[in-house]
Structure formats: C-alpha cells, structure tokens
C-alpha cells in the first residue's frame, strides 16, 4: 500500500522536486515525505473529525475505488451538512490517491468548517488519462452520496466540487449539465483546458479533449468558481490553461474568484509553507461555506 501511494506522486508532484531546488523555495523532499505531507493550514478540532473509511461507492470495479467521508465532530445523527467532494489528479492505476496526506487533511479541514469532506479514489490515470472512466466514477460517487445522504449526514442538494492538478478536466462533468445541487466549483492548480496539453493530445481525440475541457462550458449561469493558481507551476501548459479559462470566464461574465500564489509551486498547499498559501486555503474554505450556505462554527 505504501509503495502504491509513493508511486502515484509521479504525476501529482512531478515538477516540484526540481522547482524546490531554486533559491528561496521549499527544500527538496523525498517521495515518502511528500506522500505524508498535510496541507500547510490547520484549524482547531481536526484531530476530532469522525472518518468513515473505505466505503465502496461502486457495486463493482477495482478494489481501490473507495471513498472516505469526513464528518464534523459532535454532529448529531439527524443533522445534515453540505458535502465537499475532493477530486485527485492523474495517478498510476491501482494507486490509493485518497490516502495521500493532502487529501486527508483537506477532508478534515472541510469537516471542521461545518461541511462533510469527501475523498475518493477514481480511475483517472497516467500515462493514459482514462477520462471517460474517471467521469463515470465521479458520477457514481455523486450518485452514492445523494442516495446515502441520510446515513452520511449530507444535505444532498448542497454539493461543492473541488479539483486538483490533472483532475481539472473532471470539472467538466459538473459544468456540462449544471445540476442544481452543485452550488460551487473550486480548482487548485488544475488543468482547465486540455486542448493544448501534449500528454492529453497524445492519448485522446479532439472531440474528447474539448468534451473534458471545463473552458468549453463557461457561461454566465455557471456555478460560482474559485480558482487557485501556482505562479511557479512547472507543469507544461497548466497555467496557460488557467489563464485562458479566466479570460473566457470574464468574457462570459461568470462568477469567478482567482487567487494567485506568486511563489507557489505545483501543490503549493503542501509545498509552500507560507502565509500566502494559508491565505488562499482559508479563502477557499470561506468561499465554499458561503456558497453552500454554511456559517463557520
């Protein structure tokens, strides 16, 4: 299990090890350290969050397609809270991405912010993206949450979708049909237009590239967006995709907030232990609470 978690970092953190050698940047870390690293922002009560682990959100499929649900401490059985669904990026097949420190801590942050944090492992992979399969997993995860909302303390009509890194294309699943229960969308250092990405172009048709580019679904009625950008992100074409997305969002008069970390590396929420990282993480949590109609505890 530990080795699988280490392997999955190849895509998620492929450029940070190089970038970290630059002056004034975080020190170079081993893969084992990066696997365990939590988000650089903490809130009181994170250690008291109730975690429902390894739920099978699909009736069949790979054994690693599991979900963890993070519930606020002290929440009564009858109480309901909005759900925040955290979507990981591309990983080698069989890697339990939900078990990485970054997603475990984001789940806890959501829970102590009076929301239900959801992390799950899906089939978005490397080197072949398997976008259609991953989209099916995302739809299955949402269906599972809504069908089991009462048992999971979830308000099924208040959901936020959060994507990271190579998981950006899956934002298109929520944007395409614009379901009323998806109240807001968040993207952290994520691909938002894969039509210019060489790895994606090498494996997918032009039709699929457009279908899984969130930029194609921008409109004035798009759910409110929060975009976090790493200024020193070294993943080829990633920041270009964000910049194109932001320009198009403005042109379409969409509701959007953009938070840029000028010194931020890819995965700055674990790599850059500085005030700007914490400001952006706090702002993202505030955005989620506001859009989901939750007050801070």
Give residue spans per PLM region.
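C-terminal catalytic histidine-bearing segment of alpha/beta-hydrolase fold enzymes
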Residues: 228, 243, 250-297
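N-terminal cap/lid segment of alpha/beta-hydrolase-fold proteins
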Residues: 25-79
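Alpha/beta-hydrolase
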Residues: 87, 188, 261-264
């Amino acid at each position: 299990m530990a080795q699988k978690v280490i392997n999955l970092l190849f895509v998620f953190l492929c450029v940070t090890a190089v970038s970290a050698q630059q002056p004034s940047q975080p020190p170079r870390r081993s893969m084992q350290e990066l696997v365990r690293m939590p988000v650089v922002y903490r809130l009181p009560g994170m250690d008291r969050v109730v975690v429902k682990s390894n739920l099978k959100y699909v009736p069949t499929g790979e054994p690693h397609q599991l979900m963890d649900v993070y519930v606020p401490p002290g929440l009564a059985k009858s109480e309901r809270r909005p759900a925040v669904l955290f979507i990981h990026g591309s990983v080698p097949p069989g890697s339990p991405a939900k078990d990485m420190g970054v997603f475990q801590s984001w789940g806890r942050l959501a829970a102590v912010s009076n929301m239900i944090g959801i992390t799950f492992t899906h089939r978005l992979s490397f080197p072949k993206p398997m976008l259609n399969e991953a989209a099916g997993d995302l739809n299955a995860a949402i269906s599972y949450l809504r069908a089991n909302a009462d048992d999971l303390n979830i308000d099924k009509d208040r959901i936020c979708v959060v994507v990271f890194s190579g998981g950006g294309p899956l934002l298109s699943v929520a944007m395409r049909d614009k379901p009323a229960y998806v109240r807001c969308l968040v993207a952290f250092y994520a691909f938002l237009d894969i039509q210019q990405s060489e790895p994606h172009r090498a494996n997918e048709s032009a039709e699929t590239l457009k279908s899984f580019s969130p930029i194609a679904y921008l409109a004035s009625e798009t759910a409110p967006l929060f975009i976090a950008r790493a200024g020193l992100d070294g993943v080829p074409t990633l920041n270009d995709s964000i910049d194109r997305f932001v320009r198009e969002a403005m042109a379409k008069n969409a509701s959007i907030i953009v938070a840029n970390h000028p010194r931020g590396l890819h995965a700055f929420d674990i790599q850059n232990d500085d005030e700007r990282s914490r400001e952006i993480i706090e702002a993202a949590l505030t955005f989620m609470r506001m859009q989901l109609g939750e007050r801070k505890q």
